[in-house]
Amino acid sequence: MKLSKYISIAILFFSVSAAFAQQLPQFTQYMFNTISINPAYAGSRETLSVVGLHRSQWVGLEGGPETQTLSIHTPLRNEKMGLGISFINDKLGYENFSYLYADYSYTINTSANTKLAFGMKGGLTHYSLDEELLNDPSVTEDPFFNDISNRWSPNVGAGLFLHSSRWYLGLSAPRILNTDYNKGSDGLRNFVAFERISYYFTGGYVFNLSETTKLKPSALLKATNGAPLSFDISANFLFNEKLWLGGAYRINEHAAAIGGIADFQISKQMRIGYAYEYPISDIAAYTSGTHEVLLMFEVFKSKRIKSPRYF
């Protein structure tokens, strides 16, 4: 594949989502995948929880983002501390990011029904370039590409998670340290990512509409230095404690989107979710939309643990 093809892809991405790769990947089902952005969530489900997610963004556009996540977290025996480990693989055009991080949380009771968790995370980010690009004759001899590819960078994060059985509020910064992957090369700086600190503000509430129906609105605000603000809002209905159905809307200067969510509790231990998202920005002319699949598995549930959990 010619270098010009990769550069064309990069120009398109940056024209519709300025500095998109500077940020952690975004999710439509963020309300069911909180551990990926907030370490204070570790152990909050009061059981060993395993969550896997696959996201194919902007399907039909060559080089569109693809993301996979896998996280495992659990409370310890004293139930005040939680531990977790999370892995994220994110591919955007010719760039690949892999995140491997450990999570720790400590929870205190602020009232009879409310808990506040403090969280920290630490780990490594791996940055690499697509092998097809590196093997292209037009770039093989360019030391710039060889220097920036296959880099490991340490990072740390922190978060707060305040919650009861009916509502939650979260504040987190999963990557605090800034990382520049350009190594001082000015010529192609616009086509190589920076990893910059992002702040996440989350919240949600569960309303009882009837004996069999509940409504859970939720929101996520993401602020990244050098990138547009992103605001996600969603509303999900829960029917018979089994089926979630809802919609989502993302407000973003370059990557606005609307979507639908369906999530089914197969058993007390397993649930599966699907989300479809369609952009309402300039990128819509090049894609049929975004698909996202989530699978959650929980083990060692005791009878005292409420199922299903609302967040």
Placement of each model-derived feature along the sequence:
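Cleavable N-terminal signal peptides
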Residues: 8-9, 19
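Bacterial N-terminal signal peptides that target proteins for export
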Residues: 1-8
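Absolute protein N-terminus
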Residues: 1, 21-22
